[in-house]
Amino acid sequence: MSKKTYYILSFTWGLPLTVCGLLVAIVLMILGYRPKRFGWAWYFEVGRHYDGLSIGFIFFCGKYASNVTKAHEYGHSIQNTKYGWALVFLTLASAARYWYYTVMEDWLGKKLPDYDSWWFEKQATETGIHYILTPDKK
């Protein structure tokens, strides 16, 4: 995928999440946050140890987020260009799963399967890493 295709698909097929991401970005910029680039996506560092959240081609992560976390969120932005409107529902399921994992592992000490065991999360990580390591591949 080219950069041009990424943005065309983000503003057409992936428009619902792109608009939501832009609205959140505007609020954050009003509050003094400044966007940074990661691949073709824009991101904001919010908090210190926040994991991450992608909304369209914009994602949010903590100040100390690893490059793997950023690549994972970047992968979700690429999924937005692939799944478009359906990604709204996958994102809601992903958010519910994230909070389930947080409660079960962090609060209750339960051991759960790897976070990337769900195809959607695994695909985001693999896609994000692929595009960061080989951005000129189409």
Question: Residue ranges of each PLM-predicted region?
Answer:
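Short alpha-helix carrying the canonical HExxH Zn2+-binding catalytic motif
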Residues: 63-79
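Active-site scaffold of zinc-dependent metalloenzymes
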Residues: 40-66
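Catalytic Zn2+-binding segment of zinc metalloproteases
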Residues: 74-92
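Metalloprotease/metallohydrolase-associated module, dominated by Zn2+-dependent proteases
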Residues: 3-37, 41, 45-49, 89-138
